[in-house]
């Protein structure tokens, strides 16, 4: 079997609320760490989310 190209990642809020999203990314085309601006319902505003490992 071939190695999967899509992997699951965790996007953790930079507002230190502990809120996170789980999404997928293509590990072959996106080799750097992913950052996205998304809504954090704990902070009640849009903040930047950075990629971390799923434990």
From Swiss-Prot:
UniProt keyword annotations, A-Z: Ribonucleoprotein, Ribosomal protein
Protein name: Large ribosomal subunit protein bL33
A GO term from the CC aspect: cytosolic large ribosomal subunit
GO BP of this protein: translation
Pfam families for the chain: Ribosomal_L33
Organism in which the protein naturally occurs: Rhizobium rhizogenes (strain K84 / ATCC BAA-868)
One GO molecular-function entry: structural constituent of ribosome
UniProt similarity note: Belongs to the bacterial ribosomal protein bL33 family.
PROSITE patterns assigned: RIBOSOMAL_L33 (PS00582)
Source organism, top-level taxon: Bacteria
InterPro entries associated with the record: Ribosomal_bL33 (IPR001705), Ribosomal_bL33_CS (IPR018264), Ribosomal_bL33_sf (IPR038584), Ribosomal_zn-bd (IPR011332)
Gene: rpmG
